[in-house]
């Protein structure tokens, strides 16, 4: 990585192996590969591949259909869940689910297997950029927990927190923290 990228309007952000711990554990499928393009800090294209199950989610894939919400499933880190997910689940009468990689968690929301993904343990741009690109293209909400937008290609690549969720749940989820 070079800070020369800060002078570019278009920057590729790649995570060749998201979910290293899960990749190392035999039988786990919750690891991913991320590729995203940002333009002026905004993710405009992205793909999240989950090779172990032979699936790739792309920002140009319009197959995503969001089902009626029957229960609120809040997905969080398998190894570093933090209290935020439980707080949201309690406030929205939901239940907690845990998975490994950020890509696998975000794609669970994209595919309708969860409604909310919250992360408070800190990540880096490469952990969330492609999942956010796919989520936004799928009609989901993606932001920081204070509701501010996620801006990429920053000099400090640390992203302290993240919320990806169904749009109709965004206000309720954000209200828990604001």
Predicted regions and their residues:
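Exposed boundary/loop context
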Residues: 2, 12, 34, 47, ...
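Short linear motifs in intrinsically disordered/low-complexity regions
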Residues: 2, 61-62, 162
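DPxDG-like acidic metal-binding loop motif
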Residues: 6-61
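An extended, acidic
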Residues: 69-178
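N-terminal subdomain of lithium-sensitive/metallo-dependent phosphomonoesterases centered on the IMPase/IPPase/PAP
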Residues: 1-17, 87-90, 141, 168-169
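Residue-level preference for alpha-helix termini and adjacent loops
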Residues: 2, 16, 22, 30, ...
């Amino acid at each position: 990585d070079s800070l020369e990228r800060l002078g570019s309007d278009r920057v590729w952000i790649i995570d060749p192996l998201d979910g290293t711990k899960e990749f190392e554990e035999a039988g786990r499928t919750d690891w991913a590969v991320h590729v995203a393009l940002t333009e002026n800090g905004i993710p405009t294209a992205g793909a999240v591949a989950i090779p172990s199950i032979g699936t790739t989610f792309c920002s140009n894939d319009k197959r995503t259909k969001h089902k009626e919400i029957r229960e609120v499933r809040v997905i969080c880190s398998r190894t570093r869940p933090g209290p935020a997910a439980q707080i949201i689940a309690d406030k929205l009468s939901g239940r907690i689910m845990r998975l490994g990689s950020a890509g696998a968690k975000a794609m669970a929301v994209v595919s309708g297997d969860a409604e909310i993904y919250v992360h408070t343990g800190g990540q880096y741009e490469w952990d969330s950029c492609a999942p956010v690109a796919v989520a936004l293209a799928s009609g989901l909400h993606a932001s920081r927990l204070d509701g501010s937008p996620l801006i990429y290609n920053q000099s400090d690549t640390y992203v302290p927190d993240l919320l990806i969720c169904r749009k109709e749940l965004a206000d309720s989820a954000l209200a828990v923290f604001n």
